[in-house]
Amino acid sequence: MMAEPEESREPRGIRLQKVLSQAGIASRRAAEKMIVDGRVEVDGHVVTELGTRVDPQVAVVRVDGARVVLDDSLVYLALNKPRGMHSTMSDDRGRPCIGDLIERKVRGTKKLFHVGRLDADTEGLMLLTNDGELAHRLMHPSHEVPKTYLATVTGSVPRGLGRTLRAGIELDDGPAFVDDFAVVDAIPGKTLVRVTLHEGRNRIVRRLLAAAGFPVEALVRTDIGAVSLGKQRPGSVRALRSNEIGQLYQAVGL
């Protein structure tokens, strides 16, 4: 059989700037500038040629060091979990759970699962995805992805509490530490504090603050790594932006 003439063969792959544009990174023209400026890597190598073609199914593409997700079957969502709702996709006892909420708002929820949990009486940011590798790494303590909370505690918080929490407090299941602590606001009998830590043990923020002498009255998770709750309303769901996904990948070494 005669070989197909070289000039008639279709070039393999898709132009890199088109791939970046389809991934929502930038317009095609802006993506071209990113490539020329040396901000784009393909499979570990900086690419500056605009004619470069890639196979989105196998190529690992990064912009400014952050990985670009090219698989359009992958879903990444941010949920503001309301207080009183359980962090499960279904509940045998008929209690309200995030699965009920997601089912009403997002199609194809059977393939989605939640990254970690929040107590029923805690509200705030949760991530949902069908990207198993990313979810596994985000939940694994070795990657130490920071999480930030706003906690309303009983009492007036002294200046030295942050130093105490950074040094660590011994709990029943071992010592616990915070990465950052700040007083946000105070009213008679209550204080609003911001706590950042990378631990994921059960009710860790509540137990840590209670052990320090300041029981938590209300708790909201506001940040997971580069993803912030912002002005997202309780019960609302949004798709993560490309840069947020890329920074999560970067945080866990993908």
Swiss-Prot record:
Active-site residues per Swiss-Prot or TrEMBL entry: 119
Gene source species: Mycobacterium tuberculosis (strain ATCC 25618 / H37Rv)
Domain (S4 RNA-binding): residue spans on this chain: 14-81
Name under which the protein is recorded: Uncharacterized RNA pseudouridine synthase Rv1711
Family per record: Belongs to the pseudouridine synthase RsuA family.
Isomerase recorded as keyword: yes
Note from the entry: Was identified as a high-confidence drug target.
GO biological process: enzyme-directed rRNA pseudouridine synthesis
Record-linked Gene3D superfamilies: Alpha-L RNA-binding motif, Pseudouridine synthase I, catalytic domain, N-terminal subdomain, RNA-binding S4 domain
Catalyzed reaction equations: a uridine in RNA = a pseudouridine in RNA
A Pfam family it matches: S4
Cited SMART domains: S4 (SM00363)
GO MF, any single term: RNA binding
Entry superkingdom: Bacteria
Stored PANTHER family: PSEUDOURIDINE SYNTHASE FAMILY PROTEIN-RELATED, RNA-BINDING S4 DOMAIN-CONTAINING PROTEIN
InterPro entries documented for this protein: PsdUridine_s_RsuA/RluB/E/F_cat, PsdUridine_synth_cat_dom_sf, PsdUridine_synth_RsuA/RluA, PsdUridine_synth_RsuA/RluB/E/F, PsdUridine_synth_RsuA/RluB_CS, RsuA_PseudoU_synthase, S4_RNA-bd, S4_RNA-bd_sf
Keywords: Isomerase, RNA-binding
Keyword Lipid biosynthesis annotated: no
EC number in record: 5.4.99.-
